[in-house]
Amino acid sequence: MATLPPEIIAAAREAERKWRIPASISLAQWAVESGWGRHMPPGSNNPFGIKARPGDPFVTVRTREQDRDGHDYFIETAFRKFGSIAEAFDAHGALLNKPVYARARAALPDPDRFADALTGVYATDRGYGKALRAVMHGSNFCQYDGAAA
């Protein structure tokens, strides 16, 4: 089990308190999306792969995506640039509170069902929920849930 930097745990717990998204979900997405913090778009402070909207500060990166049939393809993508990791966790919580993620939120308080409901919505990878669950349980991230209580 990897040791998490204290600022990552604190950011996930604060996002849970504010947005009611389990810290275990945020931590698993941080680990999966950024390779445990090692593979963020350079200069972005964006461990979640959050894409930039018009007017957002951004960095451009070539990414691998997956179509509905499971075939990989590559695109140039503008990722949002954040001032800090804590700001990224806050934006991640806000993002998961958008209507497109209502089905995932309806699965709460079960983080496993929430993770599965993100497949095909948050990420194109058909094994996304399974990957999140493996990280959540393999790293005991559920121990950090409960900041919202």
Predicted regions, residues:
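Catalytic cores of secreted/periplasmic lytic hydrolases that degrade extracellular macromolecules
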Residues: 1-149
